[in-house]
Design a protein with these regions (language model features):
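Contiguous, non-catalytic segments that form substrate-binding/exosite surfaces or channel walls
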Residues: 224-441, 449
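An active-site-proximal "capping" alpha-helix that borders the catalytic cofactor pocket
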Residues: 246, 480-497
Length: 630
């Protein structure tokens, strides 16, 4: 039986948000509609939807049947109920795993509210309609559960809106739905001129939900906003710590539980610092905090008057965190293989461009504060479990904006997701072969190796710990695009250094280069909100311009292997210069100059789509579902 995580959680009551499906009374239509409109305006203050009594489903049955078909909706399966990784755990860790899953699923409910205020009430509406036999609602629910929300881009960069008339907002669910950029800036300017500096600082930090109060905006810390949910999570983490067999892991769980109970960023910092030291633990638990989704906060650097006031008052704007939960079992063999790179991190730091002009998380002459594990996944929830065109392959956390890095001199930790990266079915391998045949010069096929993609990812994640540690906030909405671009180019630019040092063989070097190039080809031009996909277009354009790659008029990729690393080095140098300057206009120019979709890229995209129909994906978590029953 599949357990719905949101409905499972004890104490959750969504009845007050539920949309009635009873027919509207026919009397006084005009008056009631006017009242609804006024209530809608008022509801914008706290992101509560009053609106119409019924939602209108946006996708037709034909479109839903297509998008939920297995050819279009791929599946990533987390650990099975009888997985040996689970069965081999000690009993105390098995018991702890139950509580970790119960804690993690709370973040589905929390993050849906951060994402869009319609998410939870629409979920309730769908469930009510499904109980009446509504097939359109049933198929819509499959997509809703996959993308964990009402709005999502697919792999072809089409915005999929499940509710008619409901679109994604730049401020997602962390800002009032009617707040536009110009008004946002004007309110902040007035508040700063009125001396409300602390209030503005809270609005522009990464851990608050912003609401209207009169003509101003007020921020509420996540811990206070979701007090009951976080208290439930804390209780489950404390229960897990009672039976888990690893003392270090238990210490982290207790620290994280404290941080969930009190709105104090330093409590999170202590938990983060401990988490980043975890290396030899049986279990994995993370509250992921990433800020790729918020498109409103960092627009403040685009307004000269507002930017000057922020600088004058020492306020650094940081995009809002969106929250996810990761529960897993550490794979020792995979972890040992990944750990081999740790010895080379100082060498990589030493070979960074302009290394003497900034501070890095990894020091060229000291032991690195970087741990890394390979995890067999039991559950991915909230932000890290969303399948929106793609799904998270690995993470290097905490990010540089977190206090454990800035105030406590803590380290970082890489977690790699085995169930998401591994190609296990023959069907998937056959699709991969067809894609290669349709898009890559046959002479290069010998070098394509899906395991090489994992090693490129290892380089990418460690790349986040290299380069300027701070000072990039002024890049605004381009900061994330430039950062993920930097991480990619570090992975590629360091190949010759690492091959010479013995980490890779010459054959592995070629495999990483060709596999990177083949996998970097896109099915469509993305939107600027898709940082990870924008960087791919930028790189493809840059490498083609430099003669390291070529796409024929027929859409076939050719790679000049020996030009790839020097080209990556050149691009990395340019990226580091942009990051060091931290200037919005320079960052914007760099992105837009290279974010060019050529006719050859479009031909390539059409070739890919002929052999791969996939538009999105979903996650299945059989072991997690079973643990939620117990």
């Amino acid at each position: 039986m599949e357990i719905n995580p949101i409905n499972y959680i004890a104490g959750i009551n969504l009845k007050s948000l539920k949309k009635s499906t009873e027919p509207e009374p026919q009397k006084s239509v005009d008056k009631s509609e006017n009242l609804i409109k006024e209530l809608d305006k008022m509801s914008m203050i706290n992101n509560v939807n009053i609106g119409k009594k019924d939602y209108e489903l946006n996708l037709s049955m034909e479109e839903l049947e297509k998008r939920t078909h297995k050819d279009y909706l791929t599946t990533k399966k987390m650990l099975a109920v009888d997985a040996p990784e689970y069965l081999e755990l000690e009993e105390g860790d098995k018991e702890a795993l139950k509580h970790l899953v119960k804690a993690a699923v709370v973040l589905d409910k929390v993050n849906m509210q951060l994402d869009n205020p319609n998410n939870l009430p629409f979920k309730e509406y769908l469930e009510a309609e499904i109980s009446k036999g509504n097939e359109q609602a049933k198929l819509t629910k499959i997509l809703f559960d996959a993308q964990k929300g009402v709005c999502s881009l697919d792999r072809e960069s089409n915005m999929i809106e499940l509710i008619k008339g409901v679109s994604e907002r730049p401020g997602k669910g962390v800002y009032p739905q009617d707040l536009e950029k110009d008004e946002f800036h004007a309110i902040l300017i007035k508040m700063l001129k009125d001396g409300k500096v602390d209030d503005v600082a809270k609005i522009l930090n990464q851990r608050s939900v912003v609401e209207r109060v009169g003509n101003e905006l007020v921020a509420t810390d996540y811990v206070d906003k979701f007090k009951d949910d976080f208290a439930y999570m804390a209780s489950e983490l404390e229960k897990a710590a009672e039976t888990s067999t690893n003392a270090d892991f238990n210490e982290f769980l207790i620290l994280q539980a404290k941080a969930l109970r009190t709105a104090d960023p330093m409590l999170d910092a202590y938990a983060d610092k401990k988490w980043a030291t975890l290396q030899d633990t049986p279990l994995e638990f993370t509250i992921t905090r990433e800020n790729y989704s918020d498109e409103l906060t960092e627009t403040v650097v685009e307004n000269p008057e507002l930017k000057a006031l922020l600088d004058e008052n020492g306020i650094i704007p940081v995009a809002k965190d969106f929250l996810g939960g990761r529960v897993g079992i550490i794979n020792k063999k995979g972890t040992d293989a990944i750990l081999g790179v740790k010895n080379y991190l100082p060498l990589m730091a030493h070979n960074m461009p302009f290394k003497d002009d900034y501070i890095q998380n990894i020091s060229p002459d000291k032991e690195s504060k970087q741990t890394m594990v390979d995890a067999d996944l039991v559950a991915v929830t909230g932000d890290v479990g969303e399948f929106r065109a793609c799904i998270t392959l690995a993470e290097n956390l905490p990010n540089d904006d977190k206090l454990s890095i800035k105030e406590l001199d803590g380290g970082r930790r890489n977690v790699y997701h085995r169930q998401i990266r591994l190609i296990t079915s023959e069907d998937a391998r056959e699709k991969m072969k067809k894609r290669l045949a349709a898009t890559v010069n046959p002479e290069l096929h010998q070098y394509y190796n899906d395991e090489a993609d994992h090693w490129f990812t290892v380089g990418h994640e460690n790349g986040h710990s290299l380069g300027p540690k701070s000072g990039t906030e002024g890049l605004g909405k381009y900061k994330s695009i430039i950062e993920v671009n930097k991480a990619d180019m570090i992975s590629l630019a360091m190949l010759d250094v690492l091959t010479e040092a013995g980490m890779y063989t010459p054959e592995q070097r070629k495999q990483i280069i060709v596999t990177y190039a083949a996998d970097n080809m896109m099915t469509s031009k993305p939107t600027l909100s898709q940082a990870h996909r924008v960087r791919s277009v930028m790189q493809n354009y840059y490498f083609i311009k430099e003669g390291a790659m070529e796409i024929s008029p027929e859409g076939i990729l050719n790679v000049d292997i020996e030009k790839m690393v020097p080209t990556a080095r050149k691009m990395l140098e340019e990226i580091i210069q942009v990051q060091m300057k931290g200037d919005f206009s320079k960052g914007e120019k760099y992105v837009l100059d290279n974010f060019v979709w050529t006719p050859e890229m479009e031909t390539m995209a059409q070739n890919i789509k002929k052999v791969s129909k996939t538009l999105n994906g979903k996650v299945e978590s059989p072991l997690a579902d079973k643990l939620l029953e117990s």
